[in-house]
């Protein structure tokens, strides 16, 4: 599984690290991804997802079923 949020699709960003002398070197800004076990009440089971921290906050607000429906994800295959 790649370094990508399963619900939002958030992934790493290419960027520059800029030194004091303004030398620019490439760096990768990784998304803040966490493994999270989420209770799925419709199926009465836990689902383990790799989520960004922003997705975790949104998940608490919207709920798992609604968020997965918006993202177009089938939770039975997770």
UniProtKB/Swiss-Prot annotation:
Q: State the NCBIfam families in the record.
A: L28
Q: Name one GO molecular function term.
A: structural constituent of ribosome
Q: What is this protein called?
A: Large ribosomal subunit protein bL28
Q: Which UniProt keywords apply?
A: Ribonucleoprotein, Ribosomal protein
**GO cellular component term, pick one:** ribonucleoprotein complex
State one Pfam family annotation: Ribosomal_L28
UniProt record, GO biological process: translation
Listed HAMAP family? Ribosomal_bL28
Family recorded in the similarity comment: Belongs to the bacterial ribosomal protein bL28 family.
Q: Which SUPFAM superfamilies match?
A: L28p-like (SSF143800)
């Amino acid at each position: 599984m790649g370094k990508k949020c399963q619900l939002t699709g958030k992934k790493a960003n290419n960027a520059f690290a800029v030194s004091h002398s303004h030398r620019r070197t490439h760096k990768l800004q990784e998304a803040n991804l966490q493994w999270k076990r989420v209770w799925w009440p419709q199926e009465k089971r836990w689902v383990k997802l790799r989520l960004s921290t922003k997705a975790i906050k949104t998940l608490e607000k919207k709920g798992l079923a609604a968020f997965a429906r918006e993202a177009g994800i089938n939770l039975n295959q997770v």
